[in-house]
């Protein structure tokens, strides 16, 4: 079995391509179920955010797994593999494990050290568990990753100076306007990104804020928290006439603001400029709007320069976290290496218990007048003897499994205890394809 990551992210692809490979939240479970039925794929988790779409998979063959995951991406988004391939980065084995740790800890984010990705990884993992797309390996790996990411943020100061993408959008507005007190700000979208932007706007002195959302009640709840006003999305054109700054993050699949709409609005704004920051992927605002004279459009990739603040300080903390990651990878690989010895240990235990059971039957035939209490006491103590005898051999087997040339040594181990290899191999196949649903993960 092999661990594989296929990634398209802000480093490898511009936003105009990333938006073509973005899974909507409502379709994520169906996507993981579909991927689970692809050839070679044994387990999978799909993570799709504004800055990355990544497929984490356990596959039986690396070459076959790579091909069918790329084919799945191309087919799902109705593209050719040749269109998708140049923008993909593929991580395998140790590189894949390290990448998952780094992403979850915020070390691979545009904003180094941000914590939002931790929640996104956790949510994706839980969704994958719901549709039984994870198994023995990913259930262990993702729980270990989430636990470490939480510890990394509590034991270092990397998150203290990190800014979110929403914060960066507000900072860009401040660079352009200076004080935001007299600016009319329009927020499109009442999700997490929109609320973070509104929270940062309020902290920067903005008080003339309008929130718009397809579901008006969500906009009203969010606006009320920060002394803003809520309006239905049907009044968007009128709201654009009043705004000085627009921050948009709706999660819509099509443009919410088109060039045609903005052309009409500009004619009624009497030359007043409108600064628009689109932090949605797929984008909410037609990029062609940037061609208009009075509209100044920035997308999520344009925020790179803004988020560089305090980067050197955060990179020092990132080095500490990378060391923690390397320690965790060693622990995970040790666990992974012992996974293959589980069927051998299981066969050894079963053989020992079979001997104990036969011994108890023989004893009961020879001493038929045993009371129930006496039978239980004898059974308990004979099982205790077995456990004591097996303790050291099992520990040795686990140590051997982590060594080079383990297969030959474990074969000798099986021969010493006269274990049937066909039975061991059958158990190994069961472990390999086992789906274990363990929904409890560390809280954030």
Swiss-Prot record:
Its EC number is 1.2.1.70. Pfam families: GlutR_dimer (PF00745), GlutR_N (PF05201), Shikimate_DH (PF01488). NADP(+) binds at residues 189-194. The keyword Oxidoreductase applies. The active site is at 50 (nucleophile). It is an enzyme of class 1 (oxidoreductase). Substrate binds at residues 49-52, 109, 114-116, 120. InterPro entries: 4pyrrol_synth_GluRdtase (IPR000343), 4pyrrol_synth_GluRdtase_dimer (IPR015896), 4pyrrol_synth_GluRdtase_N (IPR015895), GluRdtase_CS (IPR018214), GluRdtase_dimer_dom_sf (IPR036453), GluRdtase_N_sf (IPR036343), NAD(P)-bd_dom_sf (IPR036291), Shikm_DH/Glu-tRNA_Rdtase (IPR006151). SUPFAM superfamilies: Glutamyl tRNA-reductase catalytic, N-terminal domain (SSF69742), Glutamyl tRNA-reductase dimerization domain (SSF69075), NAD(P)-binding Rossmann-fold domains (SSF51735). It catalyses: (S)-4-amino-5-oxopentanoate + tRNA(Glu) + NADP(+) = L-glutamyl-tRNA(Glu) + NADPH + H(+). Pathway: Porphyrin-containing compound metabolism; protoporphyrin-IX biosynthesis; 5-aminolevulinate from L-glutamyl-tRNA(Glu): step 1/2. Keywords: NADP, Oxidoreductase, Porphyrin biosynthesis. GO terms for molecular function: glutamyl-tRNA reductase activity; NADP binding. One of its GO terms (biological process) is protoporphyrinogen IX biosynthetic process. It comes from the Bacteria. The record marks 99 as: Important for activity. CDD domains: NAD_bind_Glutamyl_tRNA_reduct (cd05213). Possesses an unusual extended V-shaped dimeric structure with each monomer consisting of three distinct domains arranged along a curved 'spinal' alpha-helix. The N-terminal catalytic domain specifically recognizes the glutamate moiety of the substrate. The second domain is the NADPH-binding domain, and the third C-terminal domain is responsible for dimerization. During catalysis, the active site Cys acts as a nucleophile attacking the alpha-carbonyl group of tRNA-bound glutamate with the formation of a thioester intermediate between enzyme and glutamate, and the concomitant release of tRNA(Glu). The thioester intermediate is finally reduced by direct hydride transfer from NADPH, to form the product GSA. Homodimer. Belongs to the glutamyl-tRNA reductase family. Catalyzes the NADPH-dependent reduction of glutamyl-tRNA(Glu) to glutamate 1-semialdehyde (GSA). NCBIfam families: hemA (TIGR01035). This is Glutamyl-tRNA reductase. The gene is hemA.
């Amino acid at each position: 079995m092999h661990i594989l990551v296929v990634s398209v992210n802000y480093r490898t692809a511009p936003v105009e391509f990333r938006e073509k490979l973005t899974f909507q939240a409502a379709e994520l479970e169906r996507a993981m179920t579909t991927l689970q039925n692809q050839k070679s794929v044994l387990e999978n988790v799909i993570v799709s955010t504004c800055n990355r779409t990544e497929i984490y998979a356990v596959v039986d063959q690396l070459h076959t797994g790579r091909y069918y995951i790329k084919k799945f991406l191309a087919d799902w988004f109705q593209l050719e593999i040749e269109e998708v391939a140049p923008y993909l980065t593929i991580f395998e084995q140790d590189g894949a494990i390290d990448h998952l740790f780094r992403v979850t800890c915020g070390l691979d984010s545009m904003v180094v050290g941000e914590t939002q990705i931790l929640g996104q990884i956790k949510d994706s993992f839980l969704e994958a568990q719901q549709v039984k797309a994870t198994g023995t390996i990913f259930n262990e790996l993702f729980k270990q990753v989430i636990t470490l990411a939480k510890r990394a943020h509590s034991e270092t100061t990397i998150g203290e100076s990190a800014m979110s993408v929403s914060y960066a959008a507000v900072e860009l507005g401040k660079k352009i306007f200076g004080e935001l007190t007299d600016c009319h700000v329009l927020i499109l979208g009442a999700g997490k990104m929109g609320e973070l932007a509104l929270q940062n706007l309020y902290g920067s002195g903005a008080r003339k804020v309008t929130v718009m959302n397809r579901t008006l009640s969500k906009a009203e709840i969010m606006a009320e928290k920060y002394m803003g006003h809520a309006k239905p999305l049907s009044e968007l054109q009128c709201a654009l006439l009043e705004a000085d700054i627009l921050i948009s993050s709706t999660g819509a699949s099509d443009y919410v603001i088109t060039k045609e709409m903005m052309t009409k609005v500009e004619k009624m704004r009497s030359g007043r400029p409108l600064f628009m920051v689109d932090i949605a992927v797929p984008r909410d605002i037609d990029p062609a709007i940037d061609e208009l004279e009075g509209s100044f459009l920035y997308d999520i990739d344009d925020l790179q320069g803004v988020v560089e603040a305090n980067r050197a300080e955060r990179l020092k903390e990132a080095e500490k976290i990378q060391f923690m990651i390397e320690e965790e990878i060693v622990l995970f690989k040790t666990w992974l290496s012992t996974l293959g010895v589980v069927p051998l240990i299981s066969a050894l235990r079963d053989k020992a218990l079979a001997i104990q059971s036969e011994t108890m039957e023989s004893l009961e035939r020879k001493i038929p007048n045993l009371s129930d209490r006496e039978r239980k006491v004898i059974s308990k103590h004979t099982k205790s003897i077995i456990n004591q005898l097996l303790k050291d051999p099992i520990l040795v087997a686990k140590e051997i499994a982590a060594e080079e040339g383990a297969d030959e040594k474990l074969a000798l181990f099986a021969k010493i205890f006269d274990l049937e290899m066909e039975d061991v191999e059958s158990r190994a196949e069961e472990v390999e394809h086992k789906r274990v649903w363990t929904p409890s993960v560390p809280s954030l």
